[in-house]
UniProtKB/Swiss-Prot annotation:
Belongs to the UPF0262 family. Pfam families: UPF0262. InterPro entries: UCP032146 (IPR008321). It comes from Rhizobium meliloti (strain 1021) (Ensifer meliloti). This is UPF0262 protein R00612.
Length: 158
């Protein structure tokens, strides 16, 4: 689904002070940002239209969404507790480690089984993110999936 040209993200920046991670994690970050900017639905509730820039960071163990317009006007800052994400992210890390090992040496059926589990946990995290942003930011599921990937990248780095 192509989103309205104004109800979308045009730029996403992750907190660079946390540093870099493994090549696999950095690849996940790059792909998520590329896919997110290609197609997304992102509408801060109560704001007439973007496109928007998102600065995503971790501050004092909280997830911070700083949103501005493409022109730089601040729109909103939303701060979310990480508590609802901790178990999901931990499970996701563990299954991703298994997945990265499997793609190097496992059979296709083993890789597929691990990937199905990975996708299921990723979907759970994406839905949790949508629920936590409900009433603050309207997004579609694909946008939530890509944003959840970036939340995981911040965890990995932090």
């Amino acid at each position: 689904m192509k989103a309205d040209r104004n109800l979308r993200l045009c730029d996403v920046v992750l907190d660079e002070t946390i540093g870099r991670s493994t090549p696999d994690v950095e690849h996940e970050r790059a792909v998520a940002i590329f896919d997110l900017l290609e197609e997304n639905l992102f509408e801060p509730v109560g704001h007439p239209g973007g496109p928007y820039r998102l600065n995503l960071s971790l501050v004092d163990a909280k997830l911070v969404f700083r949103i501005s317009t493409d022109g730089g006007t601040e729109v909103a800052t939303h701060i979310l507790s990480l508590t609802p994400f901790r178990r999901i992210v931990k499970d996701y890390f563990m299954i991703c480690e298994s997945y990265y090992q499997a793609i190097r040496s496992a059979t296709p059926s083993q890789i597929e089984a691990i990937d199905m589990g990975r996708r299921g946990i990723h979907n759970e995290g994406s839905q949790t993110l949508m629920d936590r942003l409900s009433g603050k930011i309207r997004l579609d599921f694909d946008t939530a999936r890509r944003l959840f990937t970036l939340v995981c990248v911040l965890y990995w780095r932090g």
